[in-house]
Amino acid sequence: MTSKYAIILAAGQGTRMKSKLYKVLHPVCGKPMVDHVLTEIEKNNMDEIVTVVGHGAEMVEKTLGDRTKYALQAEQLGTGHAVLQAEKLLGDKDGMTLIACGDTPLFTAKTFEELFEYHKSKGAVATVLTAHAENPFGYGRIIRNEIGIVEKIVEQKDATVEEATVKEINTGVYCFDNKELFAALHQIKNDNAQGEYYLPDVMEIFQKQGKVVAAYQMKNFEESMGVNDRIALSNATKVMRRRINENLMRQGVTLIDPDTTYIDIDVKVGSDTVIEPGVQLKGKTEIGADCYIGAHSEIIDSVIEDGVKVTSSYIEDAVMHKNSNIGPYSHLRPKAEIGENAHIGNFVEVKKATIGKNTKVGHLTYVGDATLGRDINVGCGTVFVNYDGINKHHTTVGDYSFIGSASNIIAPVNIADHAYVAAGSTITDDIDAHDMGIARGRQVNKKGYFDRYPVAEAARIAEEKAKEE
C-alpha cells in the first residue's frame, strides 16, 4: 500500500488581514482555518503530516499540538521554498505527498481522497487540483497544450494577456511523488515578477523531463476559496455556515431561518430539535433531541440534554439536564448545572452552582457558588450573597425547602431539608430542618404620615381630576 504524506503551508504573514493574530489561526465557524485543513487531511489516514510555519510558529504549534510535525520557514521566499523546508522530515520517504495551504478552510476530505485516487490512476509524478472559475483574477492559470496535457502553471502577475483569459485555475493543492518532488524543488529558480521560488514551477520541470503531469478538475470551485483578507474570511464563513446548517437539517434538525443561525463546526444537535432565528451555538456545545432553542440565544461549550427549552438566554460552559428550561433573558455562567425538569425563569443569573431536580428559580435572582437540592422554590428577587470583597463563599440549600421573595442569603450558610426562609429576610446563620428563618424588622404603621409627604399633594390633584371625568 502506497504511503501518504501531507505538507500544510502555513508560514505566510497575512499582512492583508491587518491583524495581530496569525492569518491561518483566524477562526471559521469556531475553528482556526489551519485546523480545518488538518482535520480534513487526517481523515485520509495519513502516514505523516508536516506543517510549514513561519511568523507566529509558536501559536500554530500550540493550536495543532502533536497532530503534525513542524518545519520552519524563517524567510518567506515563496511556496516552493516553503515546501523545501519539509525535506529533512520527508525527503527520503517513498510515497505520495499532498500539499495544501493553511488558509483554505473549505476543502473536504472527499476532495483530497479523489485527488489521491486520480493521481494514482494516472501514474503521475505530479497532479494539480484545478477548478473552473468564472472570475479567475488573482489565481494561477493552468496552461494546457493542444491535446489537453498540462504544460505549466502561470501566476497572475506573470501571465500574458492570452494566458490571463484561461478560466481553469490552480487551487493551490497538489499531489506529488514524494522523492520526485524534492528533487525538482532544487531546480526551480526565482526569475519572476515576485522574485520567489514558486512551487508550480516544478510542473514545467517534470514536463521537460518527459514525466507524467496531471490535473484533476474538482466539481465545486467554492471549496478552493482562499482567505487573504477579512472580506474573504467572511465569505468563507458564510459557505461553511451554510454547509453546517444544511447537514444538520438533513439529520432532522429544524432551523427556522438558516441564514441567521450561526453554528460552529464542532457543535452537535439531536433530531427534532427546533432552532429559531438569531441563535448562536459555539465551541463544543452539544444539544440533545427534542429541544427548543429560542431566538437570539447564545450557547457556548455547554451540554443541553434532551427536551430542554432555552428561551432567549445566554449559556456558557454549563449543563442543562433533560426537560429543564430557562428564560427569557437569563444567564448561565461557567459551572452552572441545572437539574432535570428544573425551571430557571427570566432575568436569573446562575454561576458555579448546582440546581436540583424540579427546583424553580423564577425571576430576578442571582445564584452563585451554591448547591440547591430538589423541589425547592426560590422566590423573586433572591440574592445568594457569595462574595465578601476578597473570597467567594458557598451556600447549601436542602431538598424541599422554600426561599421567600426578596431574601438575601449571606454565604457561607447551610439551609437544611424542609427549611423555610421568610420573604424579605437577610439570612446569616444556618437553618435546621423543618425550621423557619426570619430576619427582618417588624412593621410599624405611622398614623397620618402619608399626608406629610409631597406625594399627598400629587394624589389630591389626581383625585380631583378623576372626579371631573
Swiss-Prot record:
Summarize where UDP-N-acetyl-alpha-D-glucosamine binds, as residue positions. 9-12, 23, 73, 78-79, 140, 155, 170, 228, 333, 351, 366, 377
Q: Which cofactor does it need?
A: Mg(2+)
Q: How does it assemble?
A: Homotrimer.
Give the binding site residues for Mg(2+). 103, 228
> Which leading EC class covers this enzyme?
transferase
Species of origin: Ligilactobacillus salivarius (strain UCC118)
Q: Which Pfam families match?
A: Hexapep (PF00132), NTP_transferase (PF00483)
Record bears the keyword Acyltransferase: yes
Pathway entry:
Nucleotide-sugar biosynthesis; UDP-N-acetyl-alpha-D-glucosamine biosynthesis; N-acetyl-alpha-D-glucosamine 1-phosphate from alpha-D-glucosamine 6-phosphate (route II): step 2/2; Nucleotide-sugar biosynthesis; UDP-N-acetyl-alpha-D-glucosamine biosynthesis; UDP-N-acetyl-alpha-D-glucosamine from N-acetyl-alpha-D-glucosamine 1-phosphate: step 1/1; Bacterial outer membrane biogenesis; LPS lipid A biosynthesis
UniProt-annotated stretches for the region Linker: 231-251
A GO molecular function assigned to this protein is: magnesium ion binding
Q: Where is this region: Pyrophosphorylase?
A: 1-230
Places the protein is found: Cytoplasm
Q: Where is this region: N-acetyltransferase?
A: 252-469
Name assigned to this protein: Bifunctional protein GlmU
Write the Enzyme Commission number(s) for this entry: 2.7.7.23, 2.3.1.157
Q: Which reaction does it catalyse?
A: alpha-D-glucosamine 1-phosphate + acetyl-CoA = N-acetyl-alpha-D-glucosamine 1-phosphate + CoA + H(+); N-acetyl-alpha-D-glucosamine 1-phosphate + UTP + H(+) = UDP-N-acetyl-alpha-D-glucosamine + diphosphate
Is Magnesium given among the entry's keywords?
yes
Q: Which UniProt keywords apply?
A: Acyltransferase, Cell shape, Cell wall biogenesis/degradation, Cytoplasm, Magnesium, Metal-binding, Multifunctional enzyme, Nucleotidyltransferase, Peptidoglycan synthesis, Repeat, Transferase
Protein family per UniProt? In the N-terminal section; belongs to the N-acetylglucosamine-1-phosphate uridyltransferase family.
